[in-house]
């Protein structure tokens, strides 16, 4: 065995033995190593706090954020709704807003290729679909276009687009806008959609009975048939009334009806109505409105004249208008009948013309008043009162207050003539005796003026004395009588006095007859002894009787005073000859202040 060379002999070699020894050693040590690894699994040493608390807070914060995000997703349906919570936040945007694609009017959806679009009408089940406040029959093929119209985002925009497609002109160019549906107007422009020809023909007869002028056209389009009407009703109507009446007459949906007043000051609009009325397919009834004639007819254009101030002054004089605001308002109302008033409205100096007109009317009226005697003035006031009455309430009132009628007539006779020392009548007594009611009615009938001591601080408070036939000083107090005793003794006498008028030099006039009401008995107060001989006093003792309705039993109007002066003309020394212009030789031709034309014969 020893002779064999190492590594060449049979049996176990040295390599095998060495591997076997290594294998045996490792197998013996494996149990010990496994137990050691298990023992090292548990750390029995003292542990420190570390960052566990910070980790806990981070986890709680993340969980809270997740819950809040879930709530936001639950209660906010879209990002746009979230922006509505904060208008300022919604206004802030980094990316530009995308424009929504504009939809075409009555746009037909594209066919998918399977023929479903062609069978849409036949496959639709019968029923009604509510759009807004109106129910539309879906099964009706003619109403599908109306349904598409009502489902649009802007109904009026679609209606206007269809109108322009049919007539080639914008609806807004022919009409003006009324903000309120309650505003009334006789002229209306009406556009109706999806109407049948038999309904249009039947409505013509009905419109002739309720309208003075009718203009009707109908034109078909790819979307619907559009009917255009311009009507003038016999009375003014509001938009609500017109829409309700037209929808009932044409069996149309209110949402498919446009009603607006026409543009009456637009020449292109007037030319459109005038030219369209001559088409063969247009139905017209009645005479065209004046706003169409005025802007289209050559004769009407030639009749346009310049504004004449004298004609305006004559109109105000004939109607007894002296106040500027009243002149402006009443003259503007006659613009539809008077070309001169229409020219005044077109003028840029309306306010100046009104002031000039009022000034001239006051001048003419004042000169006319001064040219008449008191008797003529009283008869003029009687002639201009159309109603007839009786003077019984006046006599009963004086008798109830203890005033003798004969004494009152004698004092009034001297008062009307302005005799010195008898130019002022004073009515005094306790309150509620009817002093102001009685004297105010007389001043109103004689068209006198009222002066108030409240304006005594002004230099012009007595200016009405120069512009009236009679004046009234109502409710004179102690301060008033002191002022009269100091400064107005000459006025009480009925003598001439100087009055300071505004924008004029002091004017010398004779003080007109004056009425005074007061609660002070001037005759019993020696303080005003110099006024005792200048006034005629009537004591009213009893309170004015009141009926169950709270009104005074005695009423005094213009017709009562007219009967008073007519019945008592002889005791008052009112001459009938002075009252009748024909008897006293005066001319009966009315006053004329208009400029004469070139064709007037001299």
From Swiss-Prot:
<keyword id="KW-0067">ATP-binding</keyword>
<feature type="binding site">
    <location>
        <begin position="429"/>
        <end position="436"/>
    </location>
    <ligand>
        <name>ATP</name>
    </ligand>
</feature>
<dbReference type="GO" id="GO:0042025">
    <property type="term" value="C:host cell nucleus"/>
</dbReference>
<feature type="domain" description="SF3 helicase">
    <location>
        <begin position="403"/>
        <end position="553"/>
    </location>
</feature>
<feature type="modified residue" description="Phosphoserine; by host">
    <location>
        <position position="86"/>
    </location>
</feature>
<dbReference type="InterPro" id="IPR014015">
    <property type="entry name" value="Helicase_SF3_DNA-vir"/>
</dbReference>
<dbReference type="InterPro" id="IPR027417">
    <property type="entry name" value="P-loop_NTPase"/>
</dbReference>
<keyword id="KW-0547">Nucleotide-binding</keyword>
<feature type="region of interest" description="Disordered">
    <location>
        <begin position="573"/>
        <end position="602"/>
    </location>
</feature>
<dbReference type="GO" id="GO:0003677">
    <property type="term" value="F:DNA binding"/>
</dbReference>
<keyword id="KW-0238">DNA-binding</keyword>
<dbReference type="InterPro" id="IPR016393">
    <property type="entry name" value="Rep_E1_papillomaV"/>
</dbReference>
<dbReference type="GO" id="GO:0005524">
    <property type="term" value="F:ATP binding"/>
</dbReference>
<dbReference type="InterPro" id="IPR046935">
    <property type="entry name" value="PPV_E1_DBD_sf"/>
</dbReference>
<dbReference type="GO" id="GO:0016887">
    <property type="term" value="F:ATP hydrolysis activity"/>
</dbReference>
<keyword id="KW-1017">Isopeptide bond</keyword>
<dbReference type="InterPro" id="IPR014000">
    <property type="entry name" value="PPV_DNA_helicase_E1_N"/>
</dbReference>
<comment type="similarity">
    <text>Belongs to the papillomaviridae E1 protein family.</text>
</comment>
<keyword id="KW-0597">Phosphoprotein</keyword>
<dbReference type="GO" id="GO:0006260">
    <property type="term" value="P:DNA replication"/>
</dbReference>
<keyword id="KW-0347">Helicase</keyword>
<keyword id="KW-0378">Hydrolase</keyword>
<dbReference type="GO" id="GO:0003678">
    <property type="term" value="F:DNA helicase activity"/>
</dbReference>
<dbReference type="Pfam" id="PF20450">
    <property type="entry name" value="PPV_E1_DBD"/>
</dbReference>
<feature type="cross-link" description="Glycyl lysine isopeptide (Lys-Gly) (interchain with G-Cter in SUMO)">
    <location>
        <position position="510"/>
    </location>
</feature>
<keyword id="KW-1048">Host nucleus</keyword>
<keyword id="KW-0832">Ubl conjugation</keyword>
<keyword id="KW-0413">Isomerase</keyword>
<feature type="region of interest" description="Disordered">
    <location>
        <begin position="1"/>
        <end position="66"/>
    </location>
</feature>
<feature type="modified residue" description="Phosphoserine; by host">
    <location>
        <position position="78"/>
    </location>
</feature>
<feature type="region of interest" description="DNA-binding region">
    <location>
        <begin position="138"/>
        <end position="304"/>
    </location>
</feature>
<feature type="short sequence motif" description="Nuclear localization signal">
    <location>
        <begin position="72"/>
        <end position="74"/>
    </location>
</feature>
<dbReference type="InterPro" id="IPR001177">
    <property type="entry name" value="PPV_DNA_helicase_E1_C"/>
</dbReference>
<dbReference type="InterPro" id="IPR046832">
    <property type="entry name" value="PPV_E1_DBD"/>
</dbReference>
<keyword id="KW-0244">Early protein</keyword>
<dbReference type="Pfam" id="PF00519">
    <property type="entry name" value="PPV_E1_C"/>
</dbReference>
<protein>
    <recommendedName>
        <fullName>Replication protein E1</fullName>
        <ecNumber>5.6.2.4</ecNumber>
    </recommendedName>
</protein>
<feature type="region of interest" description="Disordered">
    <location>
        <begin position="78"/>
        <end position="126"/>
    </location>
</feature>
<comment type="subunit">
    <text>Can form hexamers. Interacts with E2 protein; this interaction increases E1 DNA binding specificity. Interacts with host DNA polymerase subunit POLA2. Interacts with host single stranded DNA-binding protein RPA1. Interacts with host TOP1; this interaction stimulates the enzymatic activity of TOP1.</text>
</comment>
<feature type="compositionally biased region" description="Polar residues">
    <location>
        <begin position="111"/>
        <end position="126"/>
    </location>
</feature>
<feature type="short sequence motif" description="Nuclear export signal">
    <location>
        <begin position="85"/>
        <end position="94"/>
    </location>
</feature>
<dbReference type="InterPro" id="IPR037102">
    <property type="entry name" value="Znf_lg_T-Ag_D1_dom_sf"/>
</dbReference>
């Amino acid at each position: 065995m020893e002779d064999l060379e190492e590594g060449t002999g049979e049996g176990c070699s040295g390599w095998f033995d060495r591997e076997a020894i290594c294998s045996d050693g490792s197998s013996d040590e494996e149990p010990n190593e496994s137990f050691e690894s298990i023992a090292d699994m548990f750390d029995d040493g003292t542990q420190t706090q570390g960052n566990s608390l910070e980790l806990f807070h981070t986890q709680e914060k993340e969980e809270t954020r997740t819950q809040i995000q879930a709530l936001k997703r639950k209660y906010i349906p879209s990002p746009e709704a979230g922006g509505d919570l904060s208008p300022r936040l919604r206004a802030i945007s980094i990316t530009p807003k995308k424009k929504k694609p504009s939809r075409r009017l009555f746009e037909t959806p594209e066919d998918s290729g399977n023929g479903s679009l062609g069978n849409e009408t036949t496959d639709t089940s019968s029923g009604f679909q509510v759009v807004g406040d109106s129910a539309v029959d879906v099964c009706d093929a003619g109403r599908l276009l109306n349904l598409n119209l009502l489902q649009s985002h802007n109904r009026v925009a679609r209606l206007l687009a269809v109108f322009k497609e049919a007539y080639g002109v914008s609806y807004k160019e022919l009409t003006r806008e009324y903000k309120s549906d309650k505003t009334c107007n006789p002229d209306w422009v009406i556009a109706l959609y999806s109407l049948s020809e038999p309904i249009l023909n039947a409505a013509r007869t009905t419109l002739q009975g309720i309208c003075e002028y009718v203009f009707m056209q109908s034109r078909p389009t790819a979307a619907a048939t559009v009917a255009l009407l311009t009507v003038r009703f016999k009375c003014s109507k509001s938009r609500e009334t017109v829409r309700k009446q037209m929808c009932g007459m044409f069996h149309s949906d209110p949402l498919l009806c446009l009603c607006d007043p026409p543009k009456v000051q637009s020449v292109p609009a007037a030319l459109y109505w005038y030219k369209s009325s001559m088409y063969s397919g247009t139905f017209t009834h009645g005479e065209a409105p004046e706003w169409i004639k005025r802007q289209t007819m050559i004769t009407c254009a030639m009749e346009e004249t310049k504004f004449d101030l004298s004609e305006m002054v004559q109109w105000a004089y004939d109607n007894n208008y002296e106040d500027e605001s009243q002149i402006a308002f009443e003259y503007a109302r006659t613009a539809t009948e008077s070309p001169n008033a229409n020219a005044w409205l077109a003028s840029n100096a309306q306010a100046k013309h009104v002031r000039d007109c009022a000034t001239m009317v006051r001048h003419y009226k004042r000169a006319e008043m001064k040219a008449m005697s008191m008797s003529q003035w009283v008869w003029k006031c009687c002639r201009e009162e159309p109603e007839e009455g009786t003077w019984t309430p006046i006599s009963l009132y004086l008798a109830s207050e203890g005033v003798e009628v004969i004494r009152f007539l004698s004092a009034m006779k001297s008062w009307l003539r302005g005799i010195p020392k008898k130019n002022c009548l004073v009515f005094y007594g306790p309150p509620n005796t009817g002093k102001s009611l009685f004297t105010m009615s007389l001043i109103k009938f004689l068209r006198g003026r009222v002066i108030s001591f409240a304006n005594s601080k002004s230099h012009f408070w007595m200016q009405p004395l120069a512009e009236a036939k009679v004046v009234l000083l109502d409710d004179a107090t102690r301060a008033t009588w002191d002022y009269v005793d100091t400064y107005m003794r000459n006025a009480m006498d009925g003598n001439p006095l100087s009055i300071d008028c505004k924008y004029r030099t002091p004017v010398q006039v004779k003080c007109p007859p004056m009425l005074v009401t007061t609660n002070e008995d001037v005759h019993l107060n020696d303080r005003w002894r110099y006024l005792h001989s200048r006034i005629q006093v009537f004591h009213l003792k009893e309170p004015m009787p009141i009926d169950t309705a709270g009104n005074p039993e005695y009423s005094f109007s213009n017709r009562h005073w007219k009967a008073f002066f007519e019945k008592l003309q002889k005791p008052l020394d009112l001459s009938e000859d002075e009252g009748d212009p024909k008897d006293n030789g005066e001319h009966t031709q009315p006053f004329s202040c208009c400029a004469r034309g070139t064709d007037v014969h001299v």
